[in-house]
From Swiss-Prot:
Name of one Pfam family that matches: MtN3_slv
Keywords on record: Cell membrane, Golgi apparatus, Membrane, Repeat, Sugar transport, Transmembrane, Transmembrane helix, Transport
One cellular component term from this protein's GO annotations in UniProt: plasma membrane
Gene name tied to this protein: slc50a1
Localization terms from the record: Golgi apparatus membrane; Cell membrane
InterPro entries to which the protein is assigned, alphabetical: SWEET, SWEET_rpt
Organism, as annotated: Xenopus laevis
Molecular function via GO: sugar transmembrane transporter activity
Transmembrane segments: 3-23, 36-56, 65-85, 96-116, 125-145, 157-177, 181-201
Protein name per UniProt: Sugar transporter SWEET1
Family the entry assigns: Belongs to the SWEET sugar transporter family.
Top-level taxon of the source organism: Eukaryota
Membrane topology: Multi-pass membrane protein
Domain MtN3/slv: from-to ranges: 6-90, 124-206
């Protein structure tokens, strides 16, 4: 159906738009040759999440999931590579990457060699990916509480909030059409947290930029 192609295209475009938000951090790292004020953990967790969903899409034969997540994993790996290049704590960050790769390899061996039934493999992998995605969407809640206390949204990105809302909404619809709760359920928190952010922007709008008047 044509509308299904449109929905798949929307999922791809919105999700890649959300993933590309890290390009601003990449430009800062390259321009300043520094990783100051840039967090590394979101790149790593998003990369692992992308790889998990890519494998799920591969087992299910879902091209939309595969396209989105292979590009997403490539972008996150690019961000991590730049971070490793300019980080003064290169050894510590590198050790985290190696540990994560080890966990990823163990997970792959578990799902591939231990669970032989395809349906069981899909169910267990889908559950794992869903829980991981939900935890990522809910992790900024502490930051949102801090914003309420400080009554300032300076640390929030409005374009990223819009991208997250559109991405989560499109994947919820996609999961409903596919009758796949492992896709539908974990994206509901993304909608909820985005709506909370919109409310915060309405309650505590960012300060307008100030301009110095030119003296004649």
């Amino acid at each position: 159906m044509d509308w299904m192609w449109l929905l798949s295209g929307a999922c791809i475009v919105f999700t890649l738009g959300m993933f590309s938000s890290g390009l601003s951090d990449l430009r800062v790292m390259v321009a300043q040759r520094s990783v100051e004020n840039i967090q590394y953990l979101p790149f790593l967790t998003t990369d692992l999440n992308n790889l998990g969903w890519f494998y799920y899409g591969y087992l299910k034969g879902d091209g939309t999931l595969m396209i989105v997540n292979v590009i997403g994993a490539s972008l996150q790996s690019l961000y991590m590579g730049a971070y490793l290049l300019y980080s003064p704590e290169r050894r510590y960050v590198g050790s985290q990457v190696l540990v994560s790769l080890g966990v990823l390899l163990l997970g792959y061996c578990y799902f591939t060699l231990w669970i032989l039934d395809l349906n069981s493999r899909l169910n267990q992998l889908g559950l794992f990916c869903s829980v991981f995605t939900i935890s990522m969407y809910l992790s900024p809640l502490a930051d949102l509480a801090q914003i309420i206390r400080s009554k300032s949204t300076k640390c929030l990105s409005f374009p990223l909030t819009v991208a997250t809302f559109l991405t989560s909404s499109s994947w919820v619809l996609y999961g409903l059409v596919q009758s796949d709760l492992y896709i539908t359920v974990p994206n509901f928190p993304g909608i909820v947290t985005s709506l909370v952010r919109f409310w915060l922007f309405s309650q505590f709008p960012p300060d307008p930029p100030t301009y110095r008047l030119l003296q004649a």
